[in-house]
């Protein structure tokens, strides 16, 4: 791993999240743990810096995590999202021990609160919006053949729903038409 010492004296290991996730997955496979267990641990380790990044943006730019960021966080972490919230808090405490700035701790708590509020209070709006269209409807409406493009379009529609830009089937069709024009 490549390391770097910052101006603040802290040592950073670039890429440790991805490399650590692969190392853990290899170890879990050698122990014959299930694919589900391996996938969950891999997601936790591979994504453990994301909340810290959201917190840094919150501190630096005074921007709370966007609906898009929240949607993508839970899309990518799946059932491990809550695990990551707890891990990020423990990781921050362990990193700073007794020198943790109160402003950083409060910001990390705020980001974690925002993530959990959206997961538990607004799941259908932000975290996992219901599908207004399925692949067959998209292929029929736009005369498409089965392809990765159909899946990418469905994902783009869901993300637009999570952002509040699409709120029904008609809006999903308009969004899809515009998206396809941009892609072609």
List where the protein language model places each region.
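C-terminal subdomains that position terminal phosphate/3'-OH groups for nucleotidyl transfer/ligation
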Residues: 1-184
């Amino acid at each position: 791993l490549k390391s770097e010492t910052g101006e603040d004296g802290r040592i950073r290991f670039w890429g440790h999240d991805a490399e650590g996730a692969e190392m853990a997955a290899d170890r879990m496979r050698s122990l014959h743990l299930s694919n589900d267990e391996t996938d969950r641990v891999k997601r936790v380790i591979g994504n453990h810096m994301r909340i810290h990044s959201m917190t840094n943006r919150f501190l630096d730019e005074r921007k709370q995590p966007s609906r898009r960021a929240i949607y993508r966080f839970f899309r990518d972490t799946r059932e491990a999202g809550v695990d990551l919230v707890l891990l990020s808090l423990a990781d921050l405490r362990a990193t700073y021990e007794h020198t943790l700035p109160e402003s950083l701790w409060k910001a990390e708590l705020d980001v974690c609160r925002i993530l959990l509020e959206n997961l538990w209070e607004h799941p259908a709006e932000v975290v996992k919006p219901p599908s207004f269209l399925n692949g067959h409807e998209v292929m029929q409406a736009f005369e498409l053949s089965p392809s990765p493009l159909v899946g990418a379009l469905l994902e783009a529609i869901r993300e637009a729903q999570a952002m509040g830009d699409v709120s029904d089937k008609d809006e999903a069709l308009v969004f899809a038409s515009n998206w396809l024009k941009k892609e072609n």
